[in-house]
Design a protein with these regions (language model features):
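Conserved acid/base catalytic micro-environments in cytosolic active-site loops
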Residues: 1-201
Length: 201
């Protein structure tokens, strides 16, 4: 299912304003030229009007940010997000599958949904990263990624108020790395394969 030249799949999960700030910080430190598909989940109410794509595009000018379309094959060097009522998950051909999140049926479980999908469908060429938040969403998904042979990372809260999200991770499976955004980006730069000169469109 996964050839050695297939891109890795990296998924970030966070919640709240601190989580958004951490996403922006990590995306601005994102290593250039890595052969990896990048997906981001931030907790949002399903009935919200969301400007997340515009915010990320403005604050992270070095990355192209897209709202994934159902069935779209995701490619490296693009940051993909879902919609508030259609959270992003991934199929085994690296195409987006936007699941039904209307009426908040997946409220505070959208990170786990994405993490579980990459663990099940991609396997060992995956990285799950949990950033700031006050909930445990992502902990079960990280455990699934670990069982599939992927890498699991957690943001070190440093001097920030410690959220339950990071605390819960320790109870659900080993973590590959804990660090700040810059350190996580440096580890990814060393671990992920480099992209060939072929341009993806």
């Amino acid at each position: 299912m996964n050839a050695d030249n297939d891109p890795y799949c990296v998924a970030l999960g966070a919640s709240g304003s601190e989580g958004l700030s951490d996403i922006i910080e990590l995306l601005n430190a994102w290593p250039k030229g890595v052969h990896a598909v990048l997906m981001v989940v931030l907790h949002r109410s399903s009935d919200d009007h969301s400007d997340l794509r515009a915010v990320l595009a403005h604050r992270c000018p070095d990355l192209h940010v897209e709202i994934a379309r159902d069935g779209q094959v995701l490619v490296p060097n693009v940051c993909y997000i879902g919609m508030p009522d259609r959270p992003l998950t991934l199929l085994d051909d690296r195409s987006a599958f936007l699941i039904d999140g209307s009426n908040d049926r997946l409220r505070n479980r959208t990170v786990d949904a994405l993490f579980h999908s990459i663990a099940e469908n991609i396997g060992k060429r995956t990285v799950g990263i949990v950033l700031s938040g006050s909930l445990d969403d992502g902990s079960r998904g990280l455990a699934a990624i670990h069982r599939a042979g992927g890498l699991t990372m957690v943001l070190d809260p440093q001097n920030k108020p410690v959220g339950m999200q990071q605390n819960a991770i320790a109870f659900d499976g080993p973590i590959t790395f804990v660090g700040n955004s810059t350190e996580i980006a440096q580890v990814l730069d060393g671990l992920l394969p480099r992209q060939s000169h072929r341009v993806h469109r």
